[in-house]
């Protein structure tokens, strides 16, 4: 069982979740919403980072698939993936939104061998675009991604459908519905 009540309190205390129904926030997607989520603020205290990673670990224990590698989405998913990878003693990779235009031109940084089972960590899922992009990038390099975990999700029906279409489940520690 995930302790969403405690996580809700930590998110509100840290300012990671803010409400303003009178003056909605404008998201990058253009949506106007009465809530704003910035999970990077959960990074400010080691006990918050560890708590989030322990919740991810509990979610992972319920899966039937062994995980070889932990992946974080750039940039906000990386620190949470790092904390989880450290706890689990697993290799870590991270996935950029797009390949670099210089150097090796990598979209994925870190060791990934074809056939490895990868757990993707994202801080926030709204429309799912960045996480799905990361799943596709990992699969293109031969990684197997069947699961994506996030700290917070808005629980949009369309987002669940998009993840179903690519045969990847996503699970959130905290959802908009839980907060209400």
Question: Which role does the model predict for each range below?
Answer:
Residues 68, 116, 146:
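Conserved acidic residues
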Residues 56-68, 135-141:
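Phosphate/pyrophosphate-binding loops at sites that engage ATP/ADP/AMP, CoA/4′-phosphopantetheine
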Residues 30, 70, 92:
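Conserved hydrophobic/aromatic pocket- or pore-lining residues that grip, position, or stack substrates
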Residues 1-63:
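Active-site-facing substrate-recognition patch
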Residues 65-74, 149-150:
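Short glycine-rich phosphate-binding loop at a beta-alpha junction
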Residues 2-13, 136-180:
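PRPP-dependent phosphoribosyltransferase catalytic core
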Residues 81-119, 127-133:
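Short, glycine/charge-rich flexible loops or terminal/linker lids adjacent to PRPP-binding catalytic cores
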């Amino acid at each position: 069982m995930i302790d969403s009540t405690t996580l809700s309190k930590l998110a509100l205390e840290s300012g990671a979740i803010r409400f303003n129904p009178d003056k909605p926030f404008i998201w990058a997607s253009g949506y106007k919403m009465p809530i704003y989520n910035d999970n990077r603020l959960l990074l400010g205290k080691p006990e918050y980072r560890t708590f989030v990673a322990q919740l991810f670990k509990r979610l992972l224990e319920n899966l039937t698939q062994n995980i070889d590698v932990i992946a974080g989405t750039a940039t906000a998913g990386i620190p949470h993936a790092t904390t989880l990878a450290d706890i689990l003693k697993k290799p870590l990779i991270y996935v950029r939104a797009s390949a670099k235009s210089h150097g090796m031109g990598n979209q994925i940084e870190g060791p990934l061998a074809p056939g490895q089972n990868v757990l993707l960590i994202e801080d926030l899922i709204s429309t799912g675009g960045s996480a799905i992009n990361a799943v596709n990038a990992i699969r293109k390099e031969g990684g197997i991604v069947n699961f994506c975990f996030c700290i917070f999700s808005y629980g949009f029906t369309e987002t669940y459908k998009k993840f179903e279409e690519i045969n990847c489940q996503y699970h959130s520690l905290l959802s908009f519905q839980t907060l209400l």
